[in-house]
UniProtKB/Swiss-Prot annotation:
This is DNA mismatch repair protein MutL. The gene is mutL. Disulfide bonds: none annotated. PANTHER family: DNA MISMATCH REPAIR PROTEIN MLH, PMS, MUTL, DNA MISMATCH REPAIR PROTEIN MLH1. SUPFAM superfamilies: ATPase domain of HSP90 chaperone/DNA topoisomerase II/histidine kinase (SSF55874), DNA mismatch repair protein MutL (SSF118116), Ribosomal protein S5 domain 2-like (SSF54211). It comes from the Bacteria. GO terms for molecular function: ATP binding; ATP hydrolysis activity; ATP-dependent DNA damage sensor activity; mismatched DNA binding. InterPro entries: DNA_mismatch_repair_CS, DNA_mismatch_repair_MutL, DNA_mismatch_S5_2-like, HATPase_C_sf, MutL/Mlh/PMS, MutL/Mlh/Pms-like, MutL_C, MutL_C_dimsub. It comes from Rickettsia typhi (strain ATCC VR-144 / Wilmington). This protein is involved in the repair of mismatches in DNA. It is required for dam-dependent methyl-directed DNA mismatch repair. May act as a 'molecular matchmaker', a protein that promotes the formation of a stable complex between two or more DNA-binding proteins in an ATP-dependent manner without itself being part of a final effector complex. Transmembrane segments: none annotated. GO terms for biological process: mismatch repair. Belongs to the DNA mismatch repair MutL/HexB family. Coiled coil: none annotated.
Amino acid sequence: MTIKFLSESTINRIAAGEVIERPASVVKELVENAVDGGSTKIDIILERAGKNLIIVSDDGIGMTDKELEIAVERHTTSKLNESDFLNIHTFGFRGEALPSIAAISKMLITSKKREADKAFQIKLIGGNKQQITVSVHNEGTKIEIRDLFFATPARLKFLKSDRTELAASLDIVKKIALAHPKISFNLIHNSKNLLKLKGQNKDFETNLKQRIIDVIGDVFIKNASYINFKTPDFSICGYTSIPTYSRASSEDQFLFINNRPIKDKLLQVALRVAYQDYLARDRYALCAIFLQIDPQLVDVNVHPAKAEVRFHDPNYVRNILIEAIKNALTNKSQVTVTTTDAIELFKNPLVNKQPPINKAINVNSKASEYISFNFNRNTVCQKLTLQSDKIEQEVGKCIEHDNQSYKQYKFGIAKAQLHTTYIISQTEDSIVIIDQHAVYERLGYEKIKYCLKNGELVKQRLLIPEIVELSSGEKADYLYENRDKLFKLSLTIEKFGEKSIIVTEVPNLLRDVNVQKLIQDLADHLSDFSKNIALKELIEHVIKIYICHYSIRAVRKLSVDEMNSLLRQMENMSFSAQCNHNRPTYIELKLKDIERLFRL
């Protein structure tokens, strides 16, 4: 077979296969061009999710007839010079997008240079140019793409449903819009307006906050920490969710390098590490984080789609991002999610399940035998006689405190304990419901971490060594092979037969633990990991298992002094708003929200 040169048309179709995967790819390239063109307003129109029609209009600098003719040729661009290949500030620079799109569609470009007298238009069908003509158009550029992939029907067959393809285009526009809050964006699909974002012209932080509210939502901002972190050659800003506000997937993680939306495994891992003390393994933080870095320290020319980057010093970037997120979270370490959702949970049963309020009341019913009310204004506490276990007198009684006491403490003064599990406390303008078990988990976690860090995790020798038989010899071998690492965690074990482990020492904090259950849990959990698991990673997992056993003792009756002591410890502890499984440790109900429960 003879070697020959490929035709220009074939080359463009091959390039299109790399750059243009779906309608969203076209939307991305055209919107990015509009941003690079200095636009303040960008309109996107789609029909059938872009399969039939894509129109992107802007009010940017526009093009002359000569520029228009050159723009649709391969490797032509106004955004790159020979000298600044390592100093790229624009979205595009390869000069591939327009000719690649034109090769697989029917393209019409109309453009008018700012302050020019005439507009010009060029049409391309399957990459074949027609003559440029004079047209009528406002300043800026309008690009119409019809019948995408008509020249490559095989690619057309692989497109997904209109719903899926539309979602991909929406996601692209939202990401670009987040990075450019000064630009207005408008997206219409099948004559229906799906996205309308007004550009802001205030300071950067205000612009960014409003754009995030418009794109991600007001609830996210209310449950997020602001990041503002700088080094001599690096800066990070944006918002990241508090640990109690999380998702089951990473879809709501928006990451940007020099305003370029990216999907980078290094940064995603950094996010996981930053939250590893506060989120369960299957939960993900929400964020919109913008990293500004010297362009010479990052390579964006990794893939034609430019969604991947390479850092000159990836470990430095990773560590800086982790530090920035942790600093931001520390500022809101005692904040839990807004009480709005909790109020709705209270309110819905009242609306749906309560009997009609005008139902006749039988004053002779048995209920009156159990409950009596004293409406004396001077009464401090109403006594209720219930057909259930009596609450301890010192826990159930009301305690008088002056207003200054309530102002003094963030979590207020303990008033009662429910079901030996929940503490009710009162603040100046709210009531707080605290989950004892979750609080003990967080307290234990912080305590064990502190002891490990300072070498204070003392061993407790068992009076009688405990023999634990595991379900397989493989699990026993795994624990035994990691015995030196476990020893550093104050757990001393030896092999005892084929499937058994003998335990001679446990951490002093867990001296009352069920050793059988502890070792079984360790074996089950850790056997899923590599036999050569790093000590740091092993410590992370073992601590979490320790805490589960440490906090079992939490479900018990507490005296008033014990409850208040627990509240004071929460106030002096970092990240007291959630346990290490991401459950909130408390819910605060403001008086104004409680009043809403009783409104019709």
